[in-house]
Amino acid sequence: MVLEEGEESCLLISRYALEELKYHGRKEPVTWETSGLRAWLNREFLDMAFSPEEQSAIRITEVDNSLGNPVFHTEGGNNTEDRVFLLSREEVMTYFPSEGERLCEPTLHSKRASLAGYSHWWTRSPGSMPYYADYINYRGAVISQNVDNKFTAIRPVIRVMTEYLHREE
């Protein structure tokens, strides 16, 4: 799903909620920079989901984590440089302004979905406590939960070279 299209690159997000994973392996203070999920997305997921040719078209993106969580005033940590990342709480509100637009169906591979048929999905933003992260629930609301919750899916975001998307095969 295209979030932004520019001359040089396009910002894409998974249309579906993919794998359900913990944001971090333990319930401890963590930011996007130090999260287990960030490490997994930029290593195992990148290698598993994309061919070498596709990986060469994915740009490194400077990910701004400076805002943290403006509602709970929790620190966002340092900015990062990632090939795969998650949207922040604020970016979710920008790209998906209404709760209905934030609803996300799971893939068949995803383990769980709510009775309404939609998945919870992580943001990269910290939650109400240093060991919480924000996620979007099955109703499209932004909520905080423990970083070691394993029943929340991911919607990876990548920035891809525009010429790669529009190439002739």
Model-derived features: where do they sit?
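Collagenous Gly-X-Y triple-helix signature in extracellular proteins
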Residues: M1-E169
